[in-house]
């Protein structure tokens, strides 16, 4: 009985070592590559700031942030800024993970809309599965009367064990 318990324990340890190495290898294999515009990093936080290519009348900038706050917990936040108060200012964020070479949506935060304001911010924390690269993709918009301005962007990605 004792010999059998030791054998099972050794087998379990061997499995943990093999599968743990496989996850690290998957991360290492892609580290430093660019997938759909996002650099895959070994950090624990990524962000972006986007400004319209042509200066708009209302939309000034948008930001998106994604950070590892605890074991498999990601905080996603973002904002949209306008040059002046507008009828509607909004931000929508998408938490994405890399699956078989493509970014797929995990969850959506927003749209968060403020009225008669120049700034909007939103934030939330999510539990995620390990073994993937994650990034934040965001949409930012301003509406004043019949004028609508919008911009999208995305961050780099980082590995969650």
Residue ranges, per PLM feature:
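N-terminal prepro-regions of secreted/extracellular proteins
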Residues: 1-67
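Short, surface-exposed binding/anchoring microloops in extracellular/periplasmic proteins
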Residues: 56-95
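A short, structured loop/turn motif at beta-sheet edges
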Residues: 68-72, 98-101, 127-134, 161
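Solvent-exposed serine/threonine-rich low-complexity stretches and specific carbohydrate-binding patches
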Residues: 93, 102-117
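Solvent-exposed strand-loop boundary residues in beta-sheet-rich modules
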Residues: 99-102, 144-146
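Exposed aromatic-hydrophobic patches
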Residues: 118-128
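Enriched for extracellular/lumenal, surface-exposed ectodomains of secreted and cell-surface proteins
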Residues: 132-147
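Short beta-strand elements
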Residues: 145-161
């Amino acid at each position: 009985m004792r010999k059998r318990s030791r054998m099972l324990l050794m087998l379990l340890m061997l499995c943990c070592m093999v599968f743990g190495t496989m996850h690290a290898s998957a991360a290492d294999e892609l580290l430093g590559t660019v997938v759909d515009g996002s650099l895959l990093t070994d950090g624990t936080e990524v962000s972006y700031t986007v400004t319209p290519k042509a200066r708009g009348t209302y939309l000034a900038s948008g930001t998106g942030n994604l950070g590892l706050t605890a074991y498999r917990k990601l905080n996603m936040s973002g904002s949209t800024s306008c040059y002046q108060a507008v009828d509607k200012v909004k931000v929508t964020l998408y938490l994405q993970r890399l699956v078989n070479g493509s970014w797929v949506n995990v969850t959506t935060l927003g749209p968060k809309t403020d009225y008669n304001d120049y700034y909007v911010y939103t934030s939330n924390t999510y539990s995620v599965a390990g073994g993937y690269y994650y990034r934040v993709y965001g949409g930012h918009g301003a509406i004043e009367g019949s004028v609508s301005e919008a911009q999208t962007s995305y961050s780099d990605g980082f590995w969650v064990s």
